[in-house]
């Protein structure tokens, strides 16, 4: 039993048992740990945990993330689930660090890395705190049992060989820019899912794609990407999220990485060069033309842009001085053909006519999440956790 206040954070839903019902994989952040300034021993030795549950509440397995998987925003400890080996049961992928302990379904445990290592400051830390030292691991595990198939040195290194200065390498020295991680399951060949990893958004960024051998669960590198050239049009184009989409409709998925798109072969497909932003949406927003489109807000060069997802040709853009921060695109009304785009510091945009919609108010459309809620074919928007 836990003695502290654990707060539910992210949840992943997947079919990990093969019984026809989904299971939940839920991350719980230890708010007592944060309130006590992330002391080396945590709060009573407890840290962030990840737990897998059946719908009836039975716990299948759980992970004590340990002292070295901590950040003040609680968003860089991630786990994803997908059926990469195509056996009808999803597996899991996550990043690990020294001292993480996996408590498997059979009652046994596996410690990741060196359990004696603790990279938290002796007197604790406050403010914008990230653990940015020590070993990192890529864990590929059985989703039903929690037993790892592979525990590998994390391929997207915090510092490359020969690099010693975090600030020089990433642009800050406290771990914010080096501690941005993404995971996914794109169909890069159009037939089988690959494992995708990425690191970095503001400046440099690194990516790798693996193919899974279903028989051995070994991971084979499909391609890698590494951009650390500040004069490159690809540099600093990442967002706080990314997407997977077949933008050119060739049957193979691309990586939609903020202001740029990476082709299924790991080469750059197109980029706007507009830099970093916070929110992006990709889809067939204009059904009257071929291919998909992207609607983004912008921070480096505010405010937003609407563009061809394949070529990055900009159809419409609003400029200004404010970091928009949020944007949304969806088919919110039958009064207008196609989708509507909306960002902070702007009014609604027709993603068919490529211009602002005269007389339409943004009241009633929030800018965080799309959802189908009331049974019709129009989308609704959802904001926060209070049901707005």
Which residues are covered by each model-predicted region?
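Beta-propeller-forming repeat regions
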Residues: 1-388
């Amino acid at each position: 039993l836990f003695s502290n206040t654990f707060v539910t954070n992210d949840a992943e839903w997947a079919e990990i048992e093969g019984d026809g019902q989904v299971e939940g994989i839920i991350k719980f952040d230890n708010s007592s740990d944060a309130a006590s300034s992330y002391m080396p021993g945590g709060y009573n030795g407890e840290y962030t945990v990840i737990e897998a549950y059946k719908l009836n509440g039975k716990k299948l397995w759980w992970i004590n993330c340990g002292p070295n998987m901590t950040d003040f925003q609680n968003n860089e400890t991630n786990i994803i689930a997908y059926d990469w080996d195509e056996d009808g049961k999803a597996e899991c992928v996550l990043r690990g660090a020294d001292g993480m302990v996996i408590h498997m379904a059979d009652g046994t445990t596996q410690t990741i890395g060196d359990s004696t290592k603790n990279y938290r400051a002796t007197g604790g830390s406050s403010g914008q705190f990230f653990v940015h030292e020590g070993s990192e691991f890529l864990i590929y595990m059985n989703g039903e049992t929690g037993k790892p198939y592979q525990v590998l040195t994390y391929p997207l290194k915090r510092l490359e060989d020969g690099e010693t200065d975090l600030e020089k390498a990433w642009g800050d020295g406290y771990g914010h820019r080096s501690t941005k991680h993404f995971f996914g399951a794109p169909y890069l060949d159009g037939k089988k899912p690959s494992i995708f990893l990425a690191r970095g958004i503001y400046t440099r960024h690194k990516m790798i794609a693996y193919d899974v051998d279903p028989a051995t669960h070994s991971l084979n590198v499909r391609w890698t990407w590494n951009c650390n050239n500040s004069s490159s049009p690809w540099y600093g184009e990442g967002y706080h999220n990314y997407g997977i989409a077949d933008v050119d409709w060739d049957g193979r998925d691309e990586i939609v990485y903020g202001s740029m798109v990476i082709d299924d072969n790991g080469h750059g497909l197109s980029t706007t060069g507009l830099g970093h932003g916070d929110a992006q949406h990709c889809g067939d927003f204009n059904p009257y033309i071929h291919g998909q489109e992207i609607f983004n807000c912008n921070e480096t060069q505010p405010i937003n842009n609407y563009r061809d997802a394949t070529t990055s040709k900009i159809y419409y853009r609003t400029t200004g001085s404010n970091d928009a921060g949020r944007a949304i695109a969806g088919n919110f009304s039958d009064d207008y053909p196609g989708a509507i785009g909306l960002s902070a510091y702007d009014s609604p945009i027709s993603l068919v006519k490529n211009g602002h919609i005269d007389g339409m108010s943004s009241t009633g459309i929030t800018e965080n999440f799309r959802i189908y809620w009331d049974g019709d074919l129009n989308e609704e928007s959802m904001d926060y956790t209070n049901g707005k």
